[in-house]
Design a protein with these regions (language model features):
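Phosphate-binding loop of NTP-binding sites
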Residues: 4-182, 189, 195
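Adenine nucleotide phosphate-binding catalytic loops in nucleotide-utilizing enzymes
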Residues: 5, 179-304
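Short active-site oxyanion
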Residues: 103-105, 157-161, 293-295, 348-355, ...
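Residue-level signal for inorganic ion chemistry
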Residues: 108, 129, 162, 253, ...
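Short, charged/polar "capping" segments at the starts of alpha-helices
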Residues: 114, 168-172, 329-332, 360-366, ...
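Glycine/threonine-rich flexible loop motifs
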Residues: 136-144, 331-335, 405-407
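Active-site beta-alpha connecting loops in nucleotide-dependent enzymes
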Residues: 281, 293, 299-377, 412-413
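A glycine-rich beta-strand to alpha-helix segment
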Residues: 381-413
Length: 413
């Protein structure tokens, strides 16, 4: 039951959201949520009451996995979700307020917000994807995040924790939970988990397995896993899974989404069919016609995300554009460029035009040069696409470069 004060707070938030839209200042979800929370701090708890909620968190893949989880849960009924990725408290309030009658919710939540958000929404399931470096000026060391998540999970023993057992840090966060579903969702980026988060000793990796040399801490046996075309689950379950989205990383995201939905009672076959329909996530992965080119846009925000995005680039594309900005939301320190393995481009894309673009295109060009990647430099991303031969162009962009490109393409029609 929502109190009178909360109703007034939500009405004020709706007015703020409307004002933001009509004045052209944005969709207004954040300002609407902020206004509502300012007037009633308990509004998130009240909006979540009576719902079965899945919280999705991790450094990379939150938006995609949340979208897939919402699709899978949709086989059970109406689902409230923050589809645009506003993953802090105000965005969650806006998402739940927008669909007050849905009895299910799939919420993307920023890693550091998970403990207090879980206290408010009492999730039925919590999905733990991966942890790696991402804007250290904002969230601090990833070991701190792991300990914060671990402490938060300890307060919610009733929640099913769907954890990626290939990620050392997320495994540690979930290790002590009483209701864990382990998913082998993949973990190709291991640079940020070379030591055990529990003992500080070395993590040894061999043949897809890992273990700590200093504690009784090792990769759990997964209940869900996948290969190129099949999702495997408990009791001999094997279901064909052909996603609309590219890459092994998205098959891992889908596996965790299905596992979470099944934990809430979804039929596995229907859940898999639902995640296979997801073909775009807030503009990511979509293909846009611009002049003589079809540009597919991939988003990457940190070294691990870049490594995954680069692995999805079509080898047969007419051109590849890599766009990098260095604004505050991106992280102004671009030293991480040297952690991304661009070297494989030198061989894989030997005859394909590669264009460095974005506000920090010069920094990127230096990195590509050291990696031995033949390239040109065109700072404007739309112009960079136009400089490629006609046909399909793969565009990989970091956060603000991605947003700028979306706006520019919208203006170009």
């Amino acid at each position: 039951m929502i109190t009178t004060r909360a109703r007034l707070a939500l009405a004020a938030g709706a007015s703020a959201r409307w004002a933001s839209r009509v004045t052209g200042r944005g969709a207004g979800a954040m300002i609407g949520g902020l206004v509502a929370m300012t007037l009633d701090r308990s509004v998130l708890r009240q909006l979540a009451a009576g719902r079965r909620t899945v919280v999705v968190t991790g450094t990379n893949g939150k938006s995609t996995t949340t979208r897939m989880t919402a699709a899978a849960l949709g086989t059970l009924g109406a689902v409230a979700t923050n589809a645009e990725g506003a993953n802090m408290d105000a965005g969650l309030v806006a998402a739940l307020a927008a669909d007050r009658h849905a009895k299910l919710a799939a919420l993307e939540v920023d890693e550091m917000h998970v403990p207090h958000v879980s206290d408010a929404v009492e999730p039925a399931a919590i999905v733990l994807l991966n942890l790696s470096r991402d804007q250290l000026d904002r969230v601090g060391e990833i070991t701190v995040i792991e300990r914060t998540l671990r402490a938060g999970l300890a307060r919610h023993r009733q929640a099913v924790v769907v954890a990626n057992c290939d990620d050392v840090l997320m495994t540690s966060a979930a290790y002590d939970s009483s209701r864990v579903v382990w998913v082998a969702a993949g973990g190709s980026w291991s640079n940020d988990s070379v030591s055990c988060p529990r003992s500080g000793e070395v993590i040894v990796r061999e043949h897809g397995h890992w273990y700590s040399t200093g504690a009784d801490f090792k990769r759990p046996c997964p209940q869900w896993w996948f290969d190129d075309h099949t999702l495997y689950g408990p009791d001999g379950l094997a279901l064909p899974m052909r996603l609309a989205l590219p890459g092994a990383v998205n098959r891992g995201n889908a596996a965790q989404a299905v596992a979470a939905a099944v934990a809430l009672g979804a039929d596995p076959r229907k859940a898999v069919a639902a995640v296979c329909t997801v073909d775009e996530v807030a503009g990511r992965y979509r293909t846009v016609r611009t002049g003589a080119h079809e540009a597919r846009i991939l988003l990457a925000k940190n070294p691990a995300g870049w490594q995954e995005a680069l692995s999805m680039v079509d080898k047969h594309a007419a051109g590849v554009v890599i766009a990098v900005n260095g604004q505050v939301p991106d992280g102004e320190d671009l030293s991480w460029l040297w952690d991304v393995r661009f070297e494989h481009f030198a061989e894989t894309f030997k005859t394909t035009p590669v264009v460095a673009a974005g506000e920090r295109g010069t920094d990127l060009a230096v990195r590509l040069g050291y990696a031995g990647v033949e390239h040109t430099l065109v700072h404007d991303t739309v112009a960079a696409i136009a400089s490629c031969p006609p046909g399909r162009v793969e565009v990989v962009a970091n956060y603000t470069a991605f947003l700028q490109l979306q706006r520019a393409l919208a203006r170009h029609g």
